[in-house]
């Protein structure tokens, strides 16, 4: 198996980032399933959906460690991970599965914001509704995997060298190199989902954020100051999560599109595209653990067992405002778990 010094650095990076992502998301799933208050059930569906998706992404990244050469409507992937021993088709399938996990993770963050917007209007949100939203949204990334069943790929050295404009040295020494073109609808659809789809997703997220803040600022709104403050903090947490792709997914998509449409004609970004994309699954679970109070409290108690249990300074069960209405009290309990 041939690897140069840059490949070795990239493999080391992939091993560290993927391993941390698997550990963080695995631990977050433990917290979701065993340390979540029952009143958070609808929201934990979205948390679990995001975490499971990101865990799957990290596993696929570790298996493939793809070096993506994107240039002039051609894509050539050099697989440096274990999947190279599984053959060309399986390597490309796992790679596409990895991309579909990335898209579903982004969609799941959007659904969390949509959930908050809807729940503020209705004051009730069934768990079945959360599952239905996740399943319906998953149809988009699932179509990415289904669409490549009949894709035409090549492992021919001469063709792949032409695809990369003969700019890659030692291409013939790699065990598994897969090339394809954007002329195929399946490849075009996958590329659009990873790049262009980000625009409507972000539009929905920030429209929901705008609507939530407008509702909370409306005079005479039914929630008291405490609940309003907690909801704003939850919105802040979701906003922070939605900003992570700005520094990971968006630059990766921009580089990919720039190389595809002749803005940049170089193979030097082969390591960067997936490297940027792979930061989100590692950072996002840490953001979730920090902002969800029961999870953060569990970490604090685990590390400093002598500390007293954290008590929210904003809301007490003895506060009569807590019992303003049954629907309102449930929503208040949900929001007090976000700080």
Curated annotation (Swiss-Prot):
Keyword tRNA-binding included in the entry's annotation: no
Cystine bridges: none
Alphabetized UniProt keyword annotations: Membrane, Transmembrane, Transmembrane helix
UniProt superkingdom: Eukaryota
Transmembrane segments: 14-34, 45-65, 94-114, 128-148, 188-208, 237-257, 269-289
InterPro entries given in the database record: 7TM_GPCR_serpentine_rcpt_Srd, Nematode_rcpt-like_delta
Pfam families to which the protein is assigned, alphabetical: 7TM_GPCR_Srd (PF10317)
Membrane topology per record: Multi-pass membrane protein
Statement: the UniProt record of this protein carries the keyword Oxidoreductase: no
Location of the protein in the cell: Membrane
One Gene Ontology cellular component annotation held by this UniProt entry: membrane
SUPFAM superfamilies found in the cross-reference section: Family A G protein-coupled receptor-like
Similarity comment text for this entry: Belongs to the nematode receptor-like protein srd family.
Entry protein name: Serpentine receptor class delta-32
Gene name of the record: srd-32
